[in-house]
Amino acid sequence: MQKVYFGLTALLQLAVVLQFYFAAVGAFSKPQSDSSYGLHSLNGMMIIPLLSILATIAAAIARVPGRAIGLAIAPLGLVVVQVLIIVIGKAFSDGDDTTPAALVIYGLHAINGLAIMAVAGANLRAARQQLSGAPA
């Protein structure tokens, strides 16, 4: 089960890296439309949370230390924060126009994305240590 846990954390890290790629694809798509960020939304709202839940289940079954289980579920919590950032940013927007306050809030979306990447990387390192039998 430790190999499954490691594999899921590796897939989670890959999904997070792809999330940044999909964000860039959406940002530079011409013409801009609601579907420009379709892959970014799908990956962020479905794939990353699913992999986080599966990695957490695998970690628990593999009986890894509690810190590693916490790292496995942390991306799901941070995805919830991502959604809240967008909702709050929209609340500070003025119809179709983005206000300076909304831009500050939306900027937190990118910073939180970096936090998700850091947690996914720590998760992968913890799974690798577990697999190799090295002390955490």
Regions flagged by a language model, labelled:
Residues M1-A136:
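Polytopic transmembrane helical bundles with strong interfacial aromatic enrichment
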